[in-house]
Every structure is written in structure tokens, then in C-alpha cells.
Amino acid sequence: MSRFSEVCSNVILRNPKHVYGRLYVVSAYAGVTDLLLEHKKSQMPGVYTAFATGGAYAEALDAVRLRFFELNASLKAEGLDVGAADLFISERVSGVLGYLNSTADLLASGYVSRTELLSAARELLASIGESHSAYNSAKILQAKGYSANFIDLSGWGDPVARTIDERIALALAGVGDRQEVSFVTGYCKGTEGIMREFDRGYSEVTFSKVAVAVKAREAVIHKEFHLSSADPKIIGPGKVVPVCNTNFDVADQLADVGMEAIHPKAAKPLEMAGIPLRVKNAFDPDHDGTLITKDYTCTESKIEVVTGTDKVSILELFDTRMVAEVGSDYRIMQVLVEHDTSYISKATNANTIDLVLWDRDLRPEMVATLESMFDVVKVIPVAIVCAIGSNIAKPGILAQATGAMAQAGINIIGVSQTARQTNMQFTVRREDFVKAQRALHAELCEKGPLDAVRIR
């Protein structure tokens, strides 16, 4: 959204005959949600953090207000009425500040649930960013002479309690009957709280629900990059290629290690409704992007994507009693459920269970509970590297992958693959993360189809 001029020419107005009859679910401008909440990667505090910790949240919010004004000024050349845009967002910010002040007073009383009120404050702050960008987008298109509609799902000024689906249905009623282009806020207010379950993935959830509500022929996500065979920053831009076609199972595998084509809980409604998802590079408009469907299987056996993460650790649980005991795994799962934690992969033998977990989920209290239950509990920082595809069931492919890493001097700590054969996961030392991806991509993606694989 921060490169709106290019998005406008490459996407919204690219085909003059197909401007209308489209709904764009928009996110906030780059960096805005980080300022309102906290930085997604570095966790640098934002307005919400200041509010939750009793800090100077009013000053932090005023700083964001100035950032909104800067963004508005940068869009003047696109036709945005900067004065009207400043007034719109300033009124929102002032309104939010008033709500936060009232909430702070309630929290100080000690008579209310801190968790519930902080959750509401987080949602309130998040909503501003999408309302700002959607409003601006509609106004710019109107200035260019198009019939454009701003659809605000934030529930601003609406005291009626509605579920997310109810609010979407109400807001979109009759939209398909009008000759216009609509810009919809990525945040949607609902009684269930969209951020309580999806947190920063909420805009894609709204996108998915909107697509299902209007029975879209196709849902298209416009990103700053292609869904490619690997991260070009690691492999090199001249070596990776767009995936072009895959299925929702592969998309789920990618999301499991943090390479999200779409939030997994947002993908599911599209998959169940039979709506194809297309991931396009907004800055490469001539390319069709990658089409994700429910039943696609590549006609040739090949690895479609090499990816992974170095932000995981092995939780190793060793106990000599496991070999003769039923239920060790069950007891571990009970602890994970209590701490709202899921694992990425698991390996077992007679007396050891290894779980690969996100580093952020390895809470000291959870580890302490497990230490009281088993002889030895270790946390080992590692990385996971995956070779993923809709059709990788080919004799010798696992040998080819492990051979490539052996040639690169990489020791494989663990291997995981299910009978569906869509994802080979390799656990390696964290320092081998980049080297392992390069080795796998060179061997499995740069050498052509797996039909060339031969067992020697």
C-alpha cells in the first residue's frame, strides 16, 4: 500500500474494462501497524505496548498521527485531498485516544478484567491503520473520476454487537449490484474479536471471509514478491522461479514454517468454498502469479519450494521408563495444550521424544513442568529446512536431498515426512540454515524435474 501509485497502475487501473466489480481488502500502509501495536519482527514497542505497560501512550499515538499526515501528504500527487484525509484520520485518532483514556481509568479501578480490556484496546488501535488506507484509496479513485466506495468494517460509531460474518454481510449487501470499485478495511470488528485468534494475520482472514461472502470467482493476493521456489535473498534472484501452480496442502506446509502464502486459517474458508487463490507480484503485472487450488497435483514429480526457519528449537525429552510405558506422548501433549503451544514436527525412539517448537513458544514455565515429569529435558537451538511440493513421491528423492546436504558438509539432526509425501523436513544446526537451503535448491530445483533421479 505504501507504493500506491504503482499498485494503482499495475493492479487497480491496469485493465480499464475491468475496474468495476472488484473489492480490494486493504492492509495498513507499511510500518503503520508496527507503530500502533509493536514491531512484528523486532517487537519494538508501539502505542499498544505503551498503553498496556502504563507508558506514555498519548504521546506515542500523537506521533502516529503525524505519521498519518506524512503519508497523506505523499499521496497528494495521486489526487488525494490532503486536508480532508488529515481531518478524517485525525478524528479517528482523537476518538481512539478518548476510548483509551476511559479504558485506562477502568483498568485503574481494579474492578474489570484486564485481559479483556487490553484485547479490546489492541483491536481498537489496529483498526485505525486499515481505515486510513481504505479511505485514502477510495478518495484517490474518486478524484481520478471513478465510482469508488469506502467500506469500513471497523465498526466505528456502531454500538450494535455483531459477529464478524454478520458485519461483513451487512456491509457488502448490494455491493455486487453497483458499478463501482470498493476498498474494504482489512480489520473487521466482531464480537469474537478477530485479533484474539488471528492477531496480526487478521487482514487475510477478512480478505478470505469477504471472498466467500460475495462468492468470488477467484481471490487474489497482491504482494511485493512472487511466491517463489525459495527466498531470492538466500538463493539469489536469478536462480529462483515463481511456483505458478500448487495446492492448499502445500500452502499449509509453507505456513507451518513461517513462509505464508496466506494465513492458514484464512486459506481454509477459501478451500472449503472452492474459491481458487492467486498470489501475484503487484510489481510484475504481466506475470500470472501462482494459482492455489484444492485438487492441483503437478503432472511431473518435482520440488516446488525450498524454505525453512532458523527460529526454532528441539525440545528433547529423555526418560528410560518410556520404553515400557504407555502414554508418555499423551502427557506431553497435555502440557502443550495447557500452554497453548503446537509443534512443527516430532521424532521418537524407545526412550526419547523430540519436538521442534518455535522459540517464542518455549516458555520457561512449560519447560519447568516437563522437567518435573521426565529424566532429562533439553532445549537445543536448531533450524528446519523443507523441500515441499504437490507431487514429490519419487524413489530416490530423499537420498538425493540428504546426499546434497552431505556434499555441503551438513549433518542432519532429524528427518520428518508423512505418507502424503508433500514435505520433507530436515532439522539441521542453526549455523547451517542458509547453506542447507542452497544445497537443496541447487540439487532439487535447479537441475530440473525429479524424473532425472536415479538410484545408484
Model-derived regions, located:
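A conserved regulatory-domain signal marking ACT and ACT-like small-molecule sensing domains
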Residues: 288-456
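Conserved H-loop
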Residues: 27, 282, 348
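Short hydrophobic alpha-helical runs that function as membrane-insertion/retention elements
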Residues: 218-222, 277-279, 345
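A conserved active-site cap/scaffold subdomain adjacent to cofactor or substrate pockets
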Residues: 247-321
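Short phosphate-binding/catalytic loops that engage adenosine nucleotides
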Residues: 20, 146, 275, 341, ...
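Nucleotide/pyrophosphate-binding catalytic subdomain
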Residues: 1-262, 267, 427-429, 448, ...
